Amino acid sequence: MKNIIATVILCLAQCLPQSAQAQQKASPQRTIILMIDGFGEDYYRASAMPHLNQLEKAGIYQVVPSLMPAVTNVNNVAIATGELPDKNGITGNVYLNPATEKEEYIEDPALLLAPTIFERAKKQGIKTALFSCKKKTIDLMGGAADIKLCPECAGAADSPWAKQFGAPPDVYSKEVSYWIFNAALATLKSNPEVGLVYIHTTDYPMHTWAPEEAESKDFLHHLDNYIGKLQQAAPDAAILITADHGLNHKSLCWDLEKACLSRNTPIKIAISPEKDRYFKHHRGMGGSSYVYLKNQADLAKVSQSLRALQGVEAVLTKAEAVKRYHLLPERIGDLLVLGDKRTVFGNLEIAESEELGEHYRSHGSLYEAHVPLFVYNAKQAPAAAYFKYNYLLAAWLYQ
């Protein structure tokens, strides 16, 4: 009898921890990922954000490099996959399709070469939700999400969220981010089985207002209130926050195709990785450019012409760009041109260059490639030293 009791006790001692581990694996901590588009540290420090301040003090906080080019697709997809562009395949908002030799927006999920966090979660039986202000985010990386919503998505105007919070606001507004937050909050409250909620706001306010302007402060104060509501709605959840890029005022734009042509060093095409369908944000102009040559023999002459332009800070060969920024060589130009803090590149209708107005703001350069990163209440998170880049924010989850 004593032997039987001892055997039972030993079995319980061995089996209970395994059962607890199995339960932990089956039901990991709920997680909220917030990607605040365009949220440089200057915006954070200029605004009253007490809830975010509290997360900073209670968790991990640091300013980290984002990825180049400093545009949304490159960084959002890297955050969602936990992989660099040479592994996930996304090198901009647009690319030159080698099959058609035409510039095309990067929206097709077939271009994605690495699994997303939604796919990783699904393999572990975890339900997920993706809420984004931008349809391209849903199209590109939301395929495996169980719940997905954007204001331009089919059915959004007739969705339960629209009935509860009104019709989706215009994408060129502050309110569109609030609408997305309300939908995410409602989901957290009514669908506790959803283990991962990913929220992506818009950078329209940052393109429109500088950090010190009242409208910018108002927008971020509203976002901070929503962060507080997220904590209240899911006090058990880990909250992971970062950004894709910052923003700066830009005063000069070069049309590199026209500039090279007028200097007798014509090129095939120059593509701004920042260009997307949200033309009102930035007019398709950004602080970096992929330049494709007509002939490889033109490389030295074209590089010389580009380096001589005011505001051009660096001209890298494809090999240099791939090595320095971990880019996929098949989806970038023969050259990568980088602007200084005040210079952007894009297509201009008439002249080869244009002086930009005092309110024009954009990104894409190294000067927008540092962002805040917050990790709060994440029970299984790595130590602070792990988070060397923004794309590592959630790379450790569901592995």
Regions found by a protein language model. Give the residues of each.
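Bacterial N-terminal signal peptides
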Residues: 6-15
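Metal-dependent active-site segment of extracytoplasmic phospho-/sulfohydrolases and closely related
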Residues: 33, 51, 219-266, 337
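Short, structured active-site-proximal loop/turn typified by the sulfatase FGly-forming signature C/S-X-P-X-R
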Residues: 44-87
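Positively charged n-region of N-terminal signal peptides that target proteins for export
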Residues: 1-4
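Catalytic metal-binding/acid-base residues of hydrolase active sites
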Residues: 39-40, 202, 209, 245-247
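His/Asp/Glu-rich, glycine-adjacent segments
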Residues: 84-210, 298-301, 307-311, 394-398
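Active-site neighborhoods of enzymes that stabilize oxyanions during catalysis
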Residues: 275-399
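Boundary at the C-terminal end of the N-terminal hydrophobic targeting segment
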Residues: 20-22
